[in-house]
């Protein structure tokens, strides 16, 4: 399932840079024996927008162009992918160059205030976390317990860097039980940003998030709620966003909007 789609339109040109996702090291186990194993190949990526340095992200590097596009989207620096002419990633220098068509309006003002969040130690967002939250309107999407169990099984069967090297988080986008996109990174905020970038390059039906289900490993932090609904359960309740956590096998907890979940106690 490739995250890249070529529409032959005026969507951004992407460099499609590649880098190894894991590297081998030697470790000593509890018996004093040396073992060769794989660990995630975390690397720094400095993002430049129209030659202006914006931020440095620590990333696995699986789909860096989509990460950068989604980061700019979720930071509300862009409102459309068509504002971007190209994204070029060069791993030799650890940099991503974003070229826009007309620049980003008031970028200095928009990036002047940075809020550090709880996202894996490096999470941060520009501006007010709560800005425009009241204007978000969600559709009437829901899911059944059977769909929930189905998507959890799909995650369990998914081939992943986590299974081979550990120490990464995974995020996925579902339509019902059908997995549309699965992304891993060293931080969940990176993974959801990458999915946000991926969605922007898809057809209109896939871009529409109102009927989709978002899955993430780890905790449902305020940053994850903001990015998936665009802050904690309190905000999820206010928006009517259904937040389900501690989901494994057939156990889960629904923290907000339980009316969106069709209960099936017979399962």
Question: Predicted segment positions?
Answer:
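Generic structural signal for well-ordered alpha-helical scaffold segments
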Residues: 156, 196-200, 225
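Cysteine/selenocysteine-centered motifs that mediate thiol-based redox chemistry or coordinate metal-sulfur cofactors
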Residues: 89-103, 208-238
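Intrinsically disordered, low-complexity regions enriched in acidic/Ser/Thr/Pro/Gln residues
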Residues: 2-170, 174-175, 181-182
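Glycine- and Gly-Pro-enriched alpha-helical subdomains that act as flexible
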Residues: 161-218, 230
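Short, solvent-exposed amphipathic alpha-helical segments in soluble enzyme
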Residues: 62-63, 72-73, 188-189, 197-200, ...
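Solvent-exposed alpha-helices and their adjacent loops that cap or buttress functional pockets
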Residues: 37-40, 89-90, 161-166, 174, ...
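Conserved catalytic-core subdomain
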Residues: 220, 224-267
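Extended, folded domain segments that form the structural surfaces/walls around functional sites
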Residues: 141, 152, 189-193, 225-235
């Amino acid at each position: 399932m490739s995250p890249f789609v070529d529409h032959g339109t005026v969507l951004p040109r992407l460099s499609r840079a590649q880098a190894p996702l894991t590297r081998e090291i030697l470790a000593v186990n509890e018996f004093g024996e040396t073992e060769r194993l794989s660990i995630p190949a975390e690397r720094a990526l400095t993002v430049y927008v129209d030659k202006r340095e914006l931020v440095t992200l620590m990333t696995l590097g699986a789909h860096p162009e989509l990460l950068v596009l989604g980061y700019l989207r979720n930071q509300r620096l862009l409102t459309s992918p068509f504002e971007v002419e190209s994204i070029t990633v060069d791993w030799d220098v650890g940099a991503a160059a974003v070229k826009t068509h007309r620049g980003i309006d008031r970028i200095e003002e928009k990036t002047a205030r940075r809020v550090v969040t709880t996202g894996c130690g490096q999470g941060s967002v520009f501006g007010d976390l709560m800005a425009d939250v009241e204007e978000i309107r969600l559709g009437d999407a829901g899911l059944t317990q059977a769909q929930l169990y189905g998507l959890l099984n799909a995650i369990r069967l998914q081939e992943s860097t986590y299974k081979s090297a550990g120490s990464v988080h995974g995020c996925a986008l579902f339509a019902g039980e059908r997995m549309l996109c699965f992304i891993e990174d060293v931080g969940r905020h990176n993974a959801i940003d990458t999915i946000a970038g991926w969605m922007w390059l898809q057809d209109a039906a896939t871009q529409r998030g109102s009927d989709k289900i978002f899955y993430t490993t780890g905790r449902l932090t305020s940053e994850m709620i903001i990015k998936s609904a665009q802050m904690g359960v309190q905000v999820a309740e206010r928006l009517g966003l259904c937040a389900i956590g501690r989901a494994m096998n057939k156990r889960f907890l629904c923290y907000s909007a339980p009316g969106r979940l069709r209960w099936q106690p017979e399962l």
